[in-house]
Amino acid sequence: ACLVGSEMCIRDRSIPTGFTQRATTGMDATLSYYYHYALLSVGSELMAAFETALAPVALSPIAMEAVSLGVSQEQITTFLLPVQSSMHPLYNPDLDYSIYLSQPFFYVLFQILILLITVYIIGSELKFHTAQEWLTTARGNILTAVVGKLLPYTFIFSVIGILANYILYGVLHIPFHGSLLMMNLMTILFIIATQALAVFIFSIFPRIAYIISIVSMVGSLGATLSGVTFPVTSMYPPVHAASYLFPVRHFTEIAQSMLYFDSGFGYYWQSAAILWLFPLVALLILPRLKHWILKDKEELSICEHETPLPRVHNTSHNSIATVIFREWRSISTNAAILLVLMGGIFAYGLLYNLMYAPNLVRKTPVAIVDNSHSALSREYIRLLNATPQASVYALTPNYLEAKEWLKQSKVDGILYLPADFDARVGRGEQSVFTVYASTDAFLNFKNLQEASSRVMLAVNDAHRAEGAVFLPPQGLLAVASSAPVNVSGTALYNYTEGYGSYLIPAVMIIIIFQTLLMVIGMVTGEEAEEFPKGKVVGKHKKLTWLQALYNISGRTFVYVMLYFVFALFLLGLLPHFFSIPNIGNGRDIITMMIPFLLGTSFFGLAASRYFTDSEAPLLMIAFFSVGYIFLSGVSYPLELMPWYWQAAHYVVPAAPAVLAFVKLNSMGGTLADIRPEMITLWIQVIVYFLLSLWVFKKKVFYFRH
């Protein structure tokens, strides 16, 4: 089988020649299947579908032979599968991906927005030297000043959060088992805690250009450490401990308690109490914020007694070399930009790889309700505990006690073995066990599904012979003259079936895209700040088309050369340290990176028309960082998205670049395999180049008299 994107192509040799003859004559027949695991959502669904569909196929030669000899279908089925499983996904029985992601990821994006806006509105007071007036209005009380500043935004954010809850659970009909009133109250508490975290971070070092970069990183890390995609309990212990420094982590635990189990306040009061700690900690650091405000007043007083030097744009646009030199100097002498480059590229890259380094979710805790207390039930429990996917948390004869453990998040599933579990097998009847699994984390659900089904197959193989006494003679003849089909499954492109192996290649491309846009936004925004109309000694004029071309070409040259070096670190070096898939041809990857970096540079320069300062662009770029992964089509098949998201895929260079890089790097594809993505990227290069040329032609630049 060969898989391209989310489509499956089955070659004519997927089922080997002579398979039917070998299977029906009792010879050794093997059926192999392959599933696409470079794209996790596609791969996991295909694997489950293959296992479900091929399980009866494996035993069909025996069943067909037995039925042809007069054995009833029920008799032979009971003999072949004496033990069967019944899987019950809790809360999301259809395993709907949109239900799983919609609620948590709205709040993941929401917390990024709250962090950025809170830092920006407080930082603007210091940046524009109005902080002293702000403090004076509050009569010197820093607590009054901060609360008065943030309260209107708290109200606005609360309205947004409550409206979102109504849309999610009312309009979109996402299943909700808790109290909507309590959910709204916890949403408001989450908003206050997130604002408090932003105040705390800003008070440590209140330089808006630096802090916005740091806060955007904090928000993105919070998205990962919320535990929505990869359970934090499966991360390294220091990373797991660090997750509790993020309000979104505690709110996620609260929301899941109400969403999945209709849990009362007693089940999540600890998470709510921790959210209250964030405002209290912010209170302790407010004196430091006041210190910075008073210090800003002193610095402003000194500046007022100095003779300001006229600021001019001492730049010629008649030489590409001059533009290159100026752009390089602007980047290398700006500490905030260097922080984005060093922090965004190196810290971001290392942290993401470190967080997902465990790669696989192991030992998902499960509670056992054993009402059988038989040798067969003990054998099943022992085999289940021996699997790498599951771990027996505790045994209890009381289902309600196991359900309490599930509500308390001590376990992620319940295995129920009925009282007649062993007796039915002994009577020649089919015995059914039940697995109740939470769907708050799909990886945990997948673990329990795989572990229970594979142990079931092992138990069936071990005890099938005992059921031979219940078969008529012709049934025994069918068993003796036939053989089951050997079924073998192989994960393509991601042999470990790990989450990090799937996600990290896509994240590395997003980091390049996001930080490059940030750099362009900060450089062009700073130019707009430093040379406002009518506030500069000099004259201004618009560029000619040739000068605009020089300007665009020079800037783009700097960005592309700089990010080629960073790409070597992110895409070439890090995969070797963290065992990330890296089977692509280096020349093909470089060929793909050329239109991606060009398109991103032109995209940023075209958008610079709307960059009026060096901080505002960071708000937009950081906010949408999480969404780029979804637009790419690696987390959810692009073909299954609504048309407007499919259209958005072709607008942002990051989306086709992620898909192209995954095909090259993780799947070992060639340039021919990424032809649609390459065409999209080159079209974006042309469109955004022309658009950026027009933008710079219309821009006003200032020159020395």
Which residues does each PLM region occupy?
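Hydrophobic core positions of alpha-helical segments in small-molecule transporters
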Residues: 147-148, 211-214, 340-341, 505, ...
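Membrane-spanning alpha-helical segments of multipass transporters and channels
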Residues: 155, 166-167, 175-312, 351-352, ...
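Hydrophobic alpha-helical transmembrane segments of multi-pass membrane transport proteins
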Residues: 88-168, 350, 490-574
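Extracytoplasmic/periplasmic domains immediately adjacent to an N-terminal transmembrane anchor
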Residues: 1-99, 300-501, 673, 698, ...
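Membrane-spanning helices that line or support transport/gating and their immediate boundary helices
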Residues: 117, 121, 125, 200, ...
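Juxtamembrane loop-helix boundary motifs flanking transmembrane segments in multi-pass membrane proteins
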Residues: 77, 90-94, 134-147, 172, ...
